[in-house]
């Protein structure tokens, strides 16, 4: 199933239609849909697709390339010789980091190939990579031999929540939020899910060959040689420990420096560091959050229960009992995306320029949307609950109180509540949204 990606596909097709040499880099976490995107762009074009492995790539590549260009059989086993036979062709090399692992000099070889053999041709060279750390350091960095040779870079991100409806047109929005808490916007996981969601999850966990048991190890091996400490940190964050001190206490690492580990997790986009929206990104009030719902789900529910799952005694009810609490955080992400869409359509009281969390001395506001130029602020409370009128009034009063603590005294203030279901949306004090508004 191919969902969304219109902008990426348009950009790729423009490159493929050009009369110039094009060198395009596509990267993003595993399972995100890089290969599908690349192959979709060339489905009606003659091309060479090669998935790099951990050894003997020269031999394997030659075999695949010969199906499109038989004369390559006469080339010696050498990348430079190969590309001499492949001028003006479309060549896709998937998992390019495997070529780098096999031979680090391949970067300089490809630099030479581009500079000497390809730059004045119509060749289209597309390389894909799932190791974000290696693609960043070895391919995209200004220190890379390939720096300055690329004509296009596409970073593939998870699909947005709204696109889940295309995977599950019969699902209600509440069930889509439940699925999103498990699969995020990762196409590979979304394609695995069947409705009803809880029946699927129960069966999947009980499968002896379930992908849930090995998937995160599979993801982490691409980024870390020794993942043990990284796993512990991710588990700590998944259970609500967001400050450096909280993470250290959870792990019992009071005297250890976790900063390098956190920095590495940020680099590969497993986690992100957030600061209150009114503060600098360098603020000491930083908190750490898992970026990917699938990874958060794994470390909250699968990783701590692997033994019980292996023994076949884990009960899905343990997840169900906690899931609404977990979805509180997930729904904040959904609400943020929803408000950004409304903002694009000019359906809010003003056009905001940034949006994020705020916290200070034990007080928190789920989202604040700001336009500092016009001095306008929208304060938002997000509740994964069914809200009656009295609940709305109580939440609004508390949100109004907290808004006075933020320090935006000269700003024009607006208020909003986003809930699972709101009894009545007639409230003159604030904007009210629930899942019905997502349609």
UniProtKB/Swiss-Prot annotation:
Residue sites binding ATP per the record: 28-35
Domain of life: Archaea
Any Pfam family matching the protein: DUF234
Keyword ATP-binding: yes
A molecular-function term among this protein's GO annotations: ATP binding
Keyword Lipid biosynthesis included in the entry's annotation: no
Keywords annotated in UniProt: ATP-binding, Nucleotide-binding, Plasmid
Protein name: Uncharacterized protein MJECL04
Record organism: Methanocaldococcus jannaschii (strain ATCC 43067 / DSM 2661 / JAL-1 / JCM 10045 / NBRC 100440) (Methanococcus jannaschii)
């Amino acid at each position: 199933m191919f969902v969304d990606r219109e902008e990426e596909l348009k950009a790729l097709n423009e490159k493929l239609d050009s009369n110039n040499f094009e060198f395009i880099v596509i990267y993003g976490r595993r399972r995100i849909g890089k290969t599908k995107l690349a192959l979709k762009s060339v489905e009606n074009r003659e091309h060479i697709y090669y998935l790099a492995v951990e050894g003997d790539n020269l031999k394997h590549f030659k075999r695949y390339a010969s199906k499109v260009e038989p004369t390559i059989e006469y080339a010696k086993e050498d990348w430079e010789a190969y590309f001499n036979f492949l001028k003006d062709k479309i060549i896709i090399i998937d998992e390019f980091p495997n070529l780098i692992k096999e031979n680090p000099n391949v970067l300089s070889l490809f630099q030479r190939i581009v500079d000497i053999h390809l730059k004045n041709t119509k060749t289209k060279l597309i390389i894909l990579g799932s190791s974000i750390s290696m693609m960043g350091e070895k391919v995209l960095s200004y220190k890379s031999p390939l720096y300055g040779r690329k004509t296009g870079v596409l970073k593939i991100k998870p699909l947005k929540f709204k696109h889940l409806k295309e995977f599950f047109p019969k699902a209600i929005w509440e069930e889509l939020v439940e699925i999103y808490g498990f699969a995020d916007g990762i196409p590979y996981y979304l394609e695995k899910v069947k409705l009803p969601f809880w029946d699927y999850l129960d069966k999947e966990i009980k499968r002896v060959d379930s992908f849930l048991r090995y998937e995160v190890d599979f993801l982490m091996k691409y980024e870390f040689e020794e993942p043990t400490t990284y796993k512990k940190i991710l588990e700590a964050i998944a259970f609500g420990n967001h400050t450096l001190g909280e993470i250290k206490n959870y792990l019992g690492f009071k005297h250890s420096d976790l900063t390098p580990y956190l920095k590495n997790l940020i680099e590969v986009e497993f986690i992100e560091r957030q600061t209150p929206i009114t503060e600098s990104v360098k603020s000491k009030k930083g908190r750490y959050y898992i970026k990917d719902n699938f990874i958060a789900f794994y470390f909250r529910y699968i990783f701590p229960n692997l033994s019980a799952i292996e023994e076949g005694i884990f009960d899905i009810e343990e997840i169900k009992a906690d899931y609404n609490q977990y979805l509180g955080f997930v729904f904040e992400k959904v609400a943020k995306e929803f408000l950004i869409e409304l903002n694009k359509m000019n359906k809010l009281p003003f056009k905001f320029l940034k949006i994020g969390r705020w916290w200070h001395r034990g007080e928190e506001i789920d989202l604040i949307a700001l336009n500092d130029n016009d001095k306008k602020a929208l304060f938002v409370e997000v509740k994964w609950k069914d809200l009656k009128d009295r609940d709305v009034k109580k939440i609004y009063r508390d949100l109004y109180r907290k808004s006075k603590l933020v320090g935006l005294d000269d700003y024009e203030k607006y208020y909003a509540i986003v809930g699972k279901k709101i009894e009545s949306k007639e409230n003159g004090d604030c904007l009210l949204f629930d899942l019905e508004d997502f349609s």
